[in-house]
Amino acid sequence: MVLRLPDPSHGGGAPPHDHTEDEWFKERYGGGGGGGDAPRSSRAVNPVPPYGRRSALAPRRKEDFGDGGAFPEVHVAQYPLDMGRRGGDGDGEQRGSSGGVLSLTVDGSGGRVEFDAVVRQGENAGKTVYSSPGDVLPKINAAAADADDDEQAAVEETTARTSAALRAIVEKRLSAVQPSNTLASNHDPEFIKYTPARQTSAFNSGAAERIIRMGETQQDPLEPPKFKHKRVPAPAGSPPVPVLRSPPRPPSQKDHDDWKVPPSISSWKNPKGYSIPLDKRAALDGRGLHDVQVSDAFAALAEALYAAEQKAREAVETRAKVHTEMKMREKEKAEQHLLQLATKARAEMLGAAPPAPSERSKAAAERDAIREERRRERRLEARAAAAAASKKSAATRDRDRDVSERIALGMANTGGGGGEVTYDQRLFNQEKGMGSGFAGDDQYNVYSGRLFAAQPALSTLYKPSKHGEEDPDAYGDADEHLGKIAKTRRFVPDKAFTGAPASVAAGKRERPVEFDGPEMEEDPFHLDQFLTQMKKGKHQ
């Protein structure tokens, strides 16, 4: 790049520019403002070489920059006015390493910030500072304090040993992951005093000697190895000791059976779908090796539950019988009371005293009472049966009926359609439908049958509404409405198509137009014809 730059305006033999005569140099180093008689600075001044001749320039001090910035064509670390230098500010004044800023520290026990580090710095660094609340508490028992110190020492020793063991494990794991060609350098850098051969001001920045720091270059840990190490094969050792063995014998059937290892059978997975007998699975589970012990408490519990159930049933039956008898007695008392009232009323109406009962009349009365009681029981049973039959609702009566008795399958539903939707269970077990492939592979029709398959259902679709009967003034009579429908020629169903022959003209229709689908061919893809042609070609 230096070779491509233009030549300087002055000739190559011109002397270098002396910055000591510049105004900025006189003002900075005491050379200006006092006239020509003012004493100049006794500090050595290194004139900056002209542009294009700075290959040997290495500015290190502030004077080398000439109160200016860094030289971009000089490829060394430059700090004009100590800007960017560690430990220095922009004015060239050195500061301390700390800079008056206290670093944040935490304690080792709980990770809490040590705020008392503010009072422990400076002149208090070597003193004992009581800054925690525990420092103001008095120590009552010195022996307990000593015991606590011993315990604390034991805890610290155990912690140190544990930490060392964990650190060793972690270092071992990390060393196994790190690359093997990383070399640890323990050599300290060497400082060499260098005196250049040329002592002029144009070389070595005017320095008579220089101290060079020499150290090892840091190696890239990811750099591949430069040399390939080959492992030397191990030398042949001593021959093995001969072992005397008996000659091999053919294994018997028992040996084969003993060496048969059953396959592993899982109780949870069977990915290959093997059929494993239950006895083999139970034997593999090992449950047959354990003796099953059934506790006697199970039998006692079952017996107690059975006895309690029988007692509860007997109690319920007894309670029901007593309740029924009480109702019967109440009914008998009511009937007897009514009979007495009726007898008394008839006697009062006749005006005659009732005859005195005799022995024969008493026996007849007992027989009549028995007959009346039996007749009353039969009447009560008949009433109960009639009440039970009358309580059976319509939904209960239709529950046992088949759906086909109430609806017509395969016909249009022209009714109101209100109420509960009823389905025939026989329709769910057919081979047709969306759940079973919808239709056969050789069928191309969308519907399995015609929409209107019966004439009686279609006749109801063209009936006039019943509004005429309810309000003849608004809608007219039903016959009149039907006549209007019959005379209406809006769609002209009996008119033939234009261009069609006259014989094709259709008459009046009583139902919608039905379109017949194309006849299904037995071989829609003409595979039989193709195979026949192929066979003929082979024979030819």
From Swiss-Prot:
Residue numbers spanned by region Disordered: 1-106, 215-273, 351-402, 502-526
Signal peptide feature range: none
Record-stated family: Belongs to the SNW family.
One Pfam family cited in the UniProt record for this chain: SKIP_SNW
Assigned GO CC terms: spliceosomal complex
Cellular compartments annotated: Nucleus
Biased composition (Pro residues): 236-251
UniProt xrefs under PANTHER family: NUCLEAR PROTEIN SKIP-RELATED
Record's keyword annotation contains Transferase: no
Official protein name in the record: SNW/SKI-interacting protein B
Annotated stretches, region: SNW: 189-353
Compositional bias (Basic and acidic residues): 16-29, 83-94, 359-382
Biased amino acid composition, Low complexity: 383-393
Lineage, top ranks: Eukaryota, Viridiplantae, Streptophyta, Embryophyta, Tracheophyta
Gene Ontology BP term (one): mRNA splicing, via spliceosome
Keywords from the UniProt entry: Nucleus
